[in-house]
Amino acid sequence: MTFAPMSRTHLPNLGLLLDVDGPIASPVTRTIAIPSIVTDLVALAAAGVPIAFITGRSDAFIREQVVEPLLAAGLADALRRPGARMYGVFEKGASWATIDAHGMGAVEVDASVSLGAAAADAVRQLVAAEFGNTMFFDETKRAMISVEQNPHIATADYVSEQARFQDAVYEVLTGDFGIGLRYRDRSMADGNGAMPFRIDPTIISTDIESVLLDKDRGAARALEQFAQLGPLPQRWRTVGDSRSDYKMADQLHADGFEVAHVDVRPSDGILERDYPVITEGDLVNDEAGAAFLAYWRAQFGPEPG
């Protein structure tokens, strides 16, 4: 996809903060399975809509499964246009990188939120010894620890083993390493009386992460980056499939922006907020994400030239 040259005197009054698993990447294939998602993202970027991916995924996953398909669809030309901005915040704010016409830039990491190599090695060994049939250790994470469902395993089989894994990893990290950790109704303080980490289950993985990490932190970092590059739109949309994704909109609302959140998995319970919460009818996950992007593409996205 290429775009005709355009002089930019003003930018669209819209910015997007997007979770990836669910609204962009299919939770089944873990890739962008709907082609229009790719082309609509490229068109919106070309129109000058600032777009940030705020995800628990690693930079490697976003580079391979999101940025590379976008580049193949013309993202480089889109990001050379006046006002175009794209950014990635990974591991819920533990790492981040610019995305420009050359692809993803150098990844920066906040080492202060890492569990450390020894703890990661222990979790890796636990998975290999007891849980390798149903899940795998994500080698691409730089700060948090993630263990993900094997793609060929049925969800019901994974869920039963996921609970057993979480109990086991809690015992390893608190007992062997003295890590201050929260897990559902259980908690163990470290030697300083603190609990700086938590076990956070998702529908396809278990994340072990700093309590400082979440989608509001990622949103704040993306806004800071975009503000360095130009004026910010007043109107924003955030899109996600989990309850924690509302925190992106919470951050924007607290900062005084006009925001609405698009919940692509409302069956988990729509949260009450002081801003609008939108659903895409009966559509869920990436089908809902595709419908959302198609709507805004029709409003702002330029046609290929």
Question: Model-predicted segments: where are they?
Answer:
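Asp-based phosphoryl-transfer active-site loop
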Residues: 9-31, 53-55, 88, 219
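Short loop/turn segments at strand-loop or loop-helix junctions that form parts
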Residues: 16-22, 90-94, 99-101, 139-142, ...
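A short acidic (Asp/Glu
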Residues: 62-66, 99-100, 147-150, 246-252, ...
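A short, Lys/Arg-enriched amphipathic alpha-helix followed by its capping loop at the start of a domain
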Residues: 6-17, 36-49, 252-255
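Active-site phosphate-binding/coordination module
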Residues: 35-139
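Conserved acidic, metal-coordinating active-site core of Asp-based
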Residues: 130-237, 244, 248
